[in-house]
UniProtKB/Swiss-Prot annotation:
Claim: Nucleotide-binding is one of the keywords in the record: no
Tissues in which the protein is found: Detected in adult eye and in embryo.
Superkingdom of the source species: Eukaryota
Cellular component, GO annotation: cytoplasm; nucleus
Subcellular location: Nucleus; Cytoplasm
Protein name according to UniProt: Putative nuclease HARBI1
Enzyme Commission designation: 3.1.-.-
The UniProt record lists the keyword Glycosyltransferase: no
MF term (GO), any: metal ion binding
Species assigned in the record: Xenopus laevis
Cysteines joined through disulfide linkages: none
Function of the protein: Transposase-derived protein that may have nuclease activity (Potential). Does not have transposase activity.
Ranges where the DDE Tnp4 domain occurs: 148-300
Family from the record: Belongs to the HARBI1 family.
């Protein structure tokens, strides 16, 4: 059960009643264009979040200066979409960095409590088949339940001696495991793995791996690049294609897998706090992982509201990550299954 949280206006204590504080901000006082330009989302989306999170962000209080759920959400959206507690967001709604930080923490926790409501694989047979059909329509690969990949999100160094979060580029980060559908909606998100871990190790240690090993492998498979090991439920490209069928399969695999690249770009374009080219998340690894997950949840809610990222102009390009290519066991069950897939559908 969600625990209601009250956030008090720290700016009243810092500046007195003459200071313009967050609880004076009203959605009705600004235009729709202003909301989209400043906070990244239109009014109906923000209203939906207020209805969704309001009970978790407020409770009866004898203090008159408690920050309302509406304005807490605006503060958090301002951070997610700009990546900064300072300047633009602070000036826009007139609060201190401390107040912004507390609002971000509380909204993030309220979203994370609802993760399973917005990020999950379909369960009923009709929805599962619809998922496969949408992937098949992309490039002709049958049986696909999702596209899986990992992405690095930069964070501040936990401490000077801990190298477990240092990735292959020498930066402290989280290695986040994502699965998306054909539209780019996230079906799975694990955001707390160490930046030093290889992608295949992240998948191997995840709950997702156990889920497919025990149950979902009977329904279909995921697609992944060659940073992952070929498995009966995880189809990777042919490393050394020899036949026209191999090449056709690889081309279809690449075309299907590209939906994950677009999804990652959309996340970083919409939520600038994840864009490592600007800054790193200035939180502990645990809180940073929650922020990443909150952004994933908001990404899915945005898609439910038909708020796709229309233009990618100005988007940061994804930096190529070092790929550890694994040798393919030619006699494995997974290899035989992929060969059967290629012969049946790409010959």
């Amino acid at each position: 059960m969600a625990v209601p949280i009250t956030v008090l206006d720290c700016d009243l204590l810092l500046y007195g009643r003459g200071h313009r504080t967050l609880d004076r901000f009203r959605l009705d006082d600004v235009t729709d264009d202003y909301l989209v330009t400043t906070y990244g989302f239109p009014r109906p989306f923000i209203d939906y979040l207020v209805d969704l999170l309001g009970a978790s962000l407020s409770r009866p209080t004898h203090r008159s200066r408690a920050i309302s759920p509406e304005t807490q959400i605006m503060a958090a959206l301002g951070f997610y979409t700009s990546g900064s507690f300072q300047t633009r967001m602070g000036d826009t709604i007139g609060i201190s960095q401390a107040s912004m930080s507390r609002c971000v923490t509380n909204v993030t926790e309220a979203l994370v409590e609802r993760a399973s409501q917005f990020i999950s694989f379909p369960r009923d047979e009709r929805s599962v088949q619809g998922l496969k059909d949408e992937f098949y329509n992309l490039a002709g690969v049958p049986g696909v339940l999702g596209v899986v990949d990992c992405t690095q999100v930069n964070i501040k160094a936990p401490n000077s001696e801990d190298l477990s979060y240092v990735n292959s580029r020498g930066l402290h980060s989280l290695n986040c495991l994502l699965v998306c559908d054909a539209r780019g909606s996230l079906l799975w998100a694990e955001t707390s793995r160490l930046g030093s871990m290889q992608d295949n190790a992240v998948l191997h240690q995840s709950e997702l791996s156990g889920l497919f090993e025990t149950k979902m492998h009977k329904q279909g498979w995921l697609l992944a690049d060659n940073a992952f090991i070929l498995r009966p439920w995880l189809m990777t490209p042919v490393q050394i294609p020899e036949s026209p069928s191999d090449y056709r399969y690889n081309m279809a695999h690449t075309a299907t897998h590209s939906v994950m690249e677009r999804t990652q770009r959309s996340l970083r374009l919409r939520f600038r706090c994840l864009d490592g080219s600007r800054a790193t998340l200035q939180y502990s690894p645990e809180k940073s992982a929650q922020i990443v997950l909150a952004c994933c949840i908001l990404h899915n809610i945005a898609l439910q509201h038909d708020l796709d990222i229309v233009s990618e102009s100005g988007a940061t390009s994804l930096e190529p990550e070092e790929e550890c290519v694994h040798m393919e066991p030619l006699e494995s069950e997974a290899y035989r299954m992929r060969q059967e897939l290629i012969l049946t559908h790409f010959s």
